């Protein structure tokens, strides 16, 4: 899955537009997310492991906010021969087009249906696995409870939800510490202070994070029987919930 180097915010701009998953971002997304999100490769690999354990024959897998298809590919590799269907949804046509190219590079007997739509419009049913990989944080906060409840209602008993998010902390000291650790991570991956600052400005109106407590409360209120944070690095976490 090739990607150009992310240089979107490398030059000073007079005005910073809100971040969008447009063709510019789609072209560098693979590089961008691996240089920005600590543990991303581990999360993607483990999605495949979860799929191997939880995806049942003749069921569906929903990848909500599929971007370039990394999660879908990881899952698909582990569920060969189960007569399952993966539905990968993204509201960016540029992402869908590149995802289609990436999926075509690998032969599989597992059907993948790509859908360009808002994930809030998708009918979730017969699902043994649902993935929200750094997606929920871009939805309006008032829509998040409803989406998680719809996911729960559309899942099979014993199904798994994997939710990965950037998170915030009520403790100001911890928030500052982990923010600084994340900034150091980005610096170590070659991002300049200008790039870091301009991207932060682009994201501030479109990405609103929750605390881990908020995520757990939302998930348990929706009806899930089991919840755990299975991975955390700085202010990035991945959670599992089982119906």
UniProtKB/Swiss-Prot annotation:
It comes from the Bacteria. Keywords: S-adenosyl-L-methionine, Transferase. GO terms for biological process: tRNA wobble uridine modification. Pfam families: Methyltransf_25. InterPro entries: CmoA, Methyltransf_25, SAM-dependent_MTases_sf. The keyword Membrane does not apply. The keyword Transferase applies. Gene3D superfamilies: Vaccinia Virus protein VP39 (3.40.50.150). GO terms for molecular function: carboxyl- or carbamoyltransferase activity; S-adenosyl-L-methionine binding. S-adenosyl-L-methionine binds at residues 40, 65-67, 90-91, 118-119, 133, 200. It catalyses: prephenate + S-adenosyl-L-methionine = carboxy-S-adenosyl-L-methionine + 3-phenylpyruvate + H2O. Signal peptide: none annotated. Its EC number is 2.1.3.-. Homodimer. HAMAP family: Cx_SAM_synthase (MF_01589). Catalyzes the conversion of S-adenosyl-L-methionine (SAM) to carboxy-S-adenosyl-L-methionine (Cx-SAM). Belongs to the class I-like SAM-binding methyltransferase superfamily. Cx-SAM synthase family. This is Carboxy-S-adenosyl-L-methionine synthase. The gene is cmoA.
